[in-house]
């Protein structure tokens, strides 16, 4: 009986996500992905010429600097991009 209980506890721990995982939108916001460890920011990339149309979305570890052609927007809450 103790073995069965221990097995159930181990399976529960393995199946549950004990750590916080960030969820970021993919290019189409209806879909999202769970970010891997170490990637704790969501991002969205815009072309400066078309600032209302995102080119790419996802998970990232450090927010890159904007350039003359590309603007990055980063955030750190679920599906904020």
UniProtKB/Swiss-Prot annotation:
Keywords in alphabetical order: Cardiotoxin, Cytolysis, Disulfide bond, Membrane, Secreted, Signal, Target cell membrane, Target membrane, Toxin
Molecular function, one GO term: toxin activity
Signal sequence bounds: 1-21
Main location: secreted
Subcellular location: Secreted; Target cell membrane
Gene Ontology cellular-component terms listed: extracellular region; membrane; other organism cell membrane
SUPFAM superfamilies tied to this protein: Snake toxin-like
UniProt note on tissues of expression: Expressed by the venom gland.
Alphabetical GO biological process terms: killing of cells of another organism
Keyword Signal: yes
Highest rank taxon of the organism: Eukaryota
Cysteine disulfide links: 24-42, 35-59, 63-74, 75-80
Assembly: Monomer in solution; Homodimer and oligomer in the presence of negatively charged lipids forming a pore with a size ranging between 20 and 30 Angstroms.
Function: Shows cytolytic activity on many different cells by forming pore in lipid membranes. In vivo, increases heart rate or kills the animal by cardiac arrest. In addition, it binds to heparin with high affinity, interacts with Kv channel-interacting protein 1 (KCNIP1) in a calcium-independent manner, and binds to integrin alpha-V/beta-3 (ITGAV/ITGB3) with moderate affinity.
Family the entry assigns: Belongs to the three-finger toxin family. Short-chain subfamily. Type IA cytotoxin sub-subfamily.
The protein's name in its UniProt record: Cytotoxin 2
């Amino acid at each position: 009986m103790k073995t069965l209980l221990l097995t159930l506890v181990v399976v529960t721990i393995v199946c549950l996500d004990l750590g916080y995982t960030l969820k970021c939108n993919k290019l189409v916001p209806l879909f999202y992905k769970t970010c891997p460890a170490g990637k704790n920011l969501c991002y969205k990339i815009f072309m400066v010429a078309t600032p209302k149309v995102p080119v790419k979305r996802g998970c990232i570890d450090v927010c890159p600097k904007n350039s003359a052609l590309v603007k990055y927007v980063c955030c750190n809450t679920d599906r904020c991009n």
